């Protein structure tokens, strides 16, 4: 049985993304918004899916998400709860009694998280008690506001400290260039340090790419973050497709991310998705019928990325793709050599291209014959991700070297003795970008491989004596 995954939604962005994620999972598992299955889940109806990773089954027909909602003000959590009919466990919600929010300050969010850590961890411990084969957490949050970044950072540290053997994945939303949060660059760099040090895998989204994709994807010209959240939820549901519609491969978080993360430092991943069909979004464009061959090659197009990528030559270290729908394996075999030709990969990267054949949910409405039959998601570990970090670091430097807005952090517990937290966080980002730059070289793993050769040689010598 696939292990259970607990989803933790932090802050306004995290909870709004979670709203669309759970709505998508309900559709794909044939569950109504009140948590009751649309089908009689008894011996006469054998499910083709596995609800256990993300839902607790309370009765034969009643399901509750393995979700925890956290915020410093009630609006976003209330919106999520009111969008469903008693779907979520009300005990799995923590909202600050003050209800004032973090005021877009990482420092305020972080300190509130530390102050209320025992209460929040009690909720998580209780949810863990309902699991039999717990695998890990997934954290939904933004990095530029106050709660998702600050409280999210303190929570990441606490999760790593208490559950060090559990896999922690973050789905982290980065701001657009036109962000209205003036201290956003500070918040982002402080959060990035925690993503570097405390997450096992971080899937990155940025609002620049999301807004551009939204304009091309939806027929409605008046798009908003409600539309971008649908794009994010499409990626989330597709990443977890092989866990919820399992086959003999890629049926755990570890089996997916082990194909993508060659070293612990290189754990930032870029999602691409195409096409956004009515299976995933409301009000999208219509697409012609396609094949897995078409989708796999289209996934390489930067225009289908949910992260703004630099246009110059980039290096891909590892790639994992899921194609969902009516898939002919011959189409995949045709596409793989062309993908290999188009991707610049270092010689040290072995088994760099991995493709999973996902299953379209049997609970979704049947497609018309003229509609496309395949959608695809690609997660890539690529040097292109550093462009997001370079933008964040550059914006941080412009503020920090002028001493702008630092007074908003002076009362924070981590800043009582000066600005070391800023300096150290910025240094962590520099080292991480250098690691990605080093990984572009064919010699990146030579030291490790040479050590392995020496060890093997040593064992051989012992055997000869």
Swiss-Prot record:
One of its GO terms (cellular component) is outer plaque of spindle pole body. GTP binds at residues 144-150. Keywords: Cytoplasm, Cytoskeleton, GTP-binding, Microtubule, Nucleotide-binding. It is found in: Cytoplasm, Cytoskeleton, Microtubule organizing center, Spindle pole body. GO terms for biological process: cytoplasmic microtubule organization; microtubule nucleation by spindle pole body; mitotic spindle organization; positive regulation of cytoplasmic translation. Belongs to the tubulin family. This is Tubulin gamma chain.
